[in-house]
Each structure stands twice: as C-alpha cells, then as structure tokens.
Design a protein with these regions (language model features):
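N-terminal cationic and glycine-rich segments that engage phosphates or anionic surfaces
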Residues: 1-116, 121-125, 130-139, 208, ...
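Positively charged, low-complexity, intrinsically disordered RNA-binding extensions
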Residues: 139-250
C-alpha cells in the first residue's frame, strides 16, 4: 500500500496542533490565487478553486483572506507574480518524487530544491524522467475510525470511485480526476469526513523502503514540504506505518 498516503494522514493529524498552521494558510492562499488565475474566480465553473476554497474553510480561514487571494489571482488586486512549477527527482532507493511549487522567484527555488534533494540522498532529474511513474487521479484518504470497509465501499463505488485500498490506519479511495468532488461529497453526505481529498499525482507502483533509507526519505519529504513555496510533494515510496509514526514523533 501507499506509504505516502499514510504519511499524509499522520501529518494531517499532527498539523492540527502544530506551529505550522501559518504555513498551511500561506500554501492555501497561494493555491487560491493560482486556481483563480488559471480557471477564473467563479467556483461553480472552476473545480480547482472549489477544492481550494473547501481546504481554506476546513482550516477556518477568514472569508476576507479567501476573497483577497482570489482577487489577486484575477488581477483585481495587486500582488506578487507567482509561477507554478513541477520539479522531478529521485529519493533514496530510487523513489520517484514530484514537487509542485508556487513561487515568486523561479531561479532561487531551483537551487533550493536541488539542495534539499542532494542533502537527503537524492538528486533532481530532467522533466519527464519521473512523471511517467504517476497518473493524475482523485485521491481521498479516510481515517478507518470514520467508517467500516463495507460502508465506505458502497458509497464510493456508487459515486464513481475506481478503487478502495486498506492503507493501515486509513482507507485510500482512488477516483478519476473529474469524479473526485462527487465521491468526496457522497462521503460527506453520509457523515464521513475525509482527512484529505484532492486531485493528485498517484504512483502507478511503489518502492519499498525500510531502516535508514526510509528515515532519509521521510526527512527529504518533510524538508520539502516545510518550504514555503512547496505546495505538494508526491512520492512512490512504501514505508511501514510504525516507521512513519516514529519519524513524525521524533
């Protein structure tokens, strides 16, 4: 199963009491701005913006902050010029890594991302070298305590999901990109709150890691995710949940 979705679930729980909430706000504001710039300010016709607004409200972001971010995206409010960039690379053990960045300084971020790869046993790669290892899918993670397998399976398959996987402490639901919102809304209507729901780059296969390589890989992901300009990190590692919990606790 996907060790990376376990990481996302455990990190989500930790973030609720973490000093990193300010960074979460910054990342969501940038996503709102980019989503509005690319697809317009109307969430009814812009699925990416709809998802970003839901994420903002899930973090109790004030409506004024949401509206200002959208207005900056459409150019109605002045703000920094942001570029969206995807970097590709390899982590320990040949794990494929995609790093989605929103930045106001493309030259600076290239050198910083390269440094974060190299100091954690990895290296950056050319465009296309790693991207083929992933496909774009809806990815919904539901804590196991929220629902039984039978209950969640019936809901998500009826709503258009492709797959449900047991990922240790969570259920991982995979959907076509265009069905993600429908599946998420079906879960919510049934009283089931996902830990996360997004259109993501989901690995087509996984690289099993343990011991020092696993710890080094998790340090790389955490270092990348902590950077203000990094929106998402996708990686095809499979690491035992106990090792992930130990890394987060440490």
């Amino acid at each position: 199963m996907s060790g990376h979705s376990k990481w996302a679930t455990i990190k989500h729980k930790k973030a609720a009491t973490d000093a990193k909430r300010g960074k979460i706000f910054t990342k969501i504001i940038r996503e709102l701005t980019i989503a509005a710039r690319v697809g317009g300010a109307d969430p009814n016709t812009n699925p990416r913006l709809r998802t970003a607004i839901l994420a903002a409200k899930g973090e109790n972001m004030p409506n004024d902050n949401i509206e200002r971010a959208i207005l900056r995206g459409t150019g109605q409010l002045e703000g920094e010029t942001l570029d969206e960039v995807m970097f590709e690379g390899y982590g320990p053990g040949g794990v494929g890594v995609l790093v989605q960045v929103v930045t106001s300084n493309r030259n600076r971020i290239v050198s910083e991302i390269r440094h974060m790869f190299s100091k954690n046993g990895g290296n950056m790669a050319e465009n296309g070298a790693v991207g083929w290892m992933f496909h774009r899918k809806g990815d919904i993670v539901v804590p196991k305590e929220a629902a039984t397998e039978d209950k969640i399976l019936g809901i998500v398959l009826d709503a258009g999901a492709e797959d449900l996987r047991d990922d240790g402490s969570a259920w991982e639901v995979t959907t076509p990109p265009e069905a993600m919102e429908k599946v998420r809304d079906a879960l919510t209507a049934a009283g089931i709150t996902p830990a996360s729901a997004e259109v993501a780059f989901v690995p087509q296969n996984y690289v099993k890691l343990s011991g020092p390589q696993a710890q080094q890989m998790l340090r790389m992901v955490e270092t990348l995710e902590d950077h203000d300009d990094v929106q998402h990190v996708y990686a095809n590692f499979d690491i035992d949940e106990k090792e992930i919990q130990a890394a987060v606790a440490g």
